[in-house]
Amino acid sequence: YKSILSDGQSSWLDGSGNKIPMFGTPSLVDSDISWQQIETLDFGIDLRFFNNKFGVTFDWFQRDTKNMIIPGESLPVTLGAAAPSGNYGSLRTKGWELSADFNHRFANGLGINITASISDASTFITKGADYLTPWEDRSLGTTYSTGRRYGDIYGFVTDRLFQKEDFVYGADGQIEKIIVIYNGTARTTYKQSSEYPVYQVHYEDGNKLIFSPGDTKFVDLDGDGYITPGTSTNGNPGDQTVIGNTTPRYEYSFRLGADYKGFDFSIYFQGIGKRKIWGNGQLAIPGYNAKEGALPKTFTTDYWTEERTNAFYPRAWDLGGSNTGFAMQKQSRYLLDMSYLRIKNITLGYTVPTNILSKIYISKARVYMSLENFFTFDNLRGLPIDPEAISGYSMFSTNYNLGRTGTGTPVFKSLSCGVQLTF
């Protein structure tokens, strides 16, 4: 956390035609920055039954992170620099973990062992950089906003896609236009057929950008007849509400193992019960950047047309490299459901009897085959996104995959076979 100067080359040339080196304004640093403190309270119970064959463990914890280093509250742009980070944040996380295990060997020699666990936790910001700001004026876009649950996603609740029958048509077969008054300004939009129309003119320009059949229709939560983001504050969220949370919830795992007369088998499951994100990039957002030409098959086969009115995705549109815009505002319908169940490993092995090995001076030999990450069950509607690795990264900071959902290195599937020998 030292104040540094960013270096680079200006657009000015010296007498030899070379670009002149330059240094940027030094970053601001809080002179009183210090270590953050973590306090943890934990209660646990560990029980064993049936001659130690069955066990249950339960833990409940509360973790307080105090004086956490987070960005300061936004300062006027006339300052000329970003607000410095400092010890402005405090979090409280509450969670629990339950695990159980069982092992037994039957009289016929069959042995089984089972382990399972599930855990959950949620975090609330007890103090953010905006703690002095009145509650009603705190921005919905602030990650560490005082009193808010960490990871909450604010957006619109999607009703459905507009259909042709939602609009009024003239004698020429074209949708009729009308003038509505929005925030004291006359706005041109398409006339709706509903007795109680809800207009979305906040995101229209009255010309090319007008909500039409195939575009997303949002729910008017505040009942004023318009879809708006308000001031995007706690006190005036408009029609925005919490539509999801990025924190993984209900993380679970399950392992089953068995062995019998030299054969052994194990299978390991892992998953997350609940998690939502608003994606970024061509794999997550339909129409993200049409000029790139790269998009999943799911988008090309399930977008709205007059012949496919029950499609999941809206009519084709080019967002010009943005993950929000026009009909593709942050909304419940197109949040990515990152819950999943993955079979992480399946192993089958056979241990050769020792009476056979003794003849060739080997004390133990085992052959095995193992499958890694071969089977995944998710709710991503066929999108090629790994729910365990969601963010892309580019070493060149290019616009192709920097921060884009699903474009990072995926979890690889692998099949391996081997022989383990002990002499």
Role assignments for model-derived ranges:
Residues 1-153, 330-423:
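Extracellular/periplasmic, surface-exposed regions of secreted and cell-surface proteins
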